[in-house]
C-alpha cells in the first residue's frame, strides 16, 4: 500500500459510505480522486466540506483510496444564496469533466482563486464564464473567439454558429443559437460591459460544454432553477 504526499485539496462532493465512513471526491493540482474517509462523523467529517481549503494524504494504489490525514489549510469560503449554487455548479463540472487522477494545476489554481471571489460577493456571471472557458481550454476543448474555423477574423456584423469540435462558423441564414460577431469579440476581450456580451457568453459556454456532459442534466443547475421558481414566504 502506498502513501501519497500531503497535497492541497478541496472536497467536491461527499456522501455516506457504509456505517461511519464517507465516499469523498477530492480535487487537487494532481487531479480529481475518490477516497474513503473513515470516522466521517468525527472531526475529519466536519472538515470534509466543499469550499474549505484542506491538506490531505491518501493511501492505496487503486482508483478508490483511503484518507490517511485531513487537516484545515486556510479560511473556509462561506458561500450562500446564488454564490453557493454557483460553487456547486463548478464542483459538478469538475466531477463530470475531469478524468480521474489527471494533473490539472492550472484548473486547480483557477478554482482556488475563484472561491474567495464568490464568497466576497463578486458578480457571478463573469466568474462562471471565466472558469468554464479555462476548463474547456485546459481539457483541449477550447476554440478561438477572434477567428472563425477558416482562419478569417470575426466580423462584428456577421453571424456565427458554434461547431463544438471545430470552432465558430459564419452563417448567412437566421437560425436558433447564433452569435453576433460583436458579441464574440467582446468575449475575446473579456469586455462584459458590452451589451449582450454576458448573455451571449452564457449561451456559448452552454453549447460548448453540452457535448462533453454526456446528455445528462446538471443537478446543480436544476437545483438553482427550482430555487428561483419556488415561491418566497
Swiss-Prot record:
SUPFAM superfamilies: ArfGap/RecO-like zinc finger, Nucleic acid-binding proteins. The keyword DNA damage applies. Keywords: DNA damage, DNA recombination, DNA repair. InterPro entries: ARFGAP/RecO, DNA_rep/recomb_RecO_N, NA-bd_OB-fold, RecO, RecO_C. The keyword DNA damage applies. One of its GO terms (cellular component) is bacterial nucleoid. GO terms for biological process: DNA recombination; double-strand break repair. Coiled coil: none annotated. It comes from the Bacteria. Pfam families: RecO_C, RecO_N. HAMAP family: RecO (MF_00201). Involved in DNA repair and RecF pathway recombination. Belongs to the RecO family. This is DNA repair protein RecO. It comes from Pseudomonas paraeruginosa (strain DSM 24068 / PA7) (Pseudomonas aeruginosa (strain PA7)).
Amino acid at each position: 500500500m502506498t502513501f501519497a504526499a500531503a497535497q492541497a485539496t478541496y472536497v467536491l462532493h461527499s456522501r455516506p459510505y457504509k456505517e461511519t465512513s464517507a465516499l469523498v471526491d477530492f480535487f487537487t493540482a494532481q487531479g480529481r480522486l475518490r477516497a474513503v474517509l473513515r470516522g466521517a462523523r468525527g472531526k475529519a467529517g466536519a472538515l470534509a466540506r466543499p469550499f474549505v481549503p484542506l491538506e490531505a494524504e491518501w493511501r492505496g494504489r487503486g482508483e478508490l483510496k483511503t484518507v490517511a490525514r485531513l487537516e484545515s489549510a486556510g479560511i473556509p469560503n462561506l458561500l450562500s444564496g446564488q454564490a453557493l449554487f454557483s460553487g456547486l455548479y463548478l464542483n459538478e463540472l469538475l466531477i463530470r469533466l475531469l478524468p480521474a487522477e489527471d494533473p490539472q494545476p492550472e484548473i486547480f489554481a483557477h478554482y482556488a482563486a475563484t472561491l474567495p471571489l464568490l464568497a466576497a460577493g463578486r458578480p457571478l456571471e463573469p466568474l462562471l464564464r471565466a472558469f468554464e472557458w479555462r476548463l474547456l481550454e485546459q481539457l483541449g476543448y477550447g476554440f478561438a473567439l477572434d477567428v472563425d474555423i477558416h482562419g478569417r477574423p470575426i466580423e462584428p456584423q456577421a453571424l456565427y454558429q458554434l461547431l463544438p469540435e471545430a470552432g465558430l462558423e459564419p452563417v448567412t441564414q437566421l437560425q436558433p443559437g447564433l452569435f453576433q460577431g460583436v458579441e464574440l469579440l467582446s468575449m475575446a476581450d473579456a469586455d462584459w460591459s458590452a451589451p449582450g456580451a454576458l448573455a451571449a457568453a452564457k449561451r456559448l459556454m452552454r453549447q460548448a460544454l453540452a457535448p462533453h456532459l454526456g446528455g445528462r442534466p446538471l443537478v446543480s443547475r436544476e437545483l438553482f432553477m427550482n430555487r428561483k421558481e419556488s415561491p418566497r414566504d
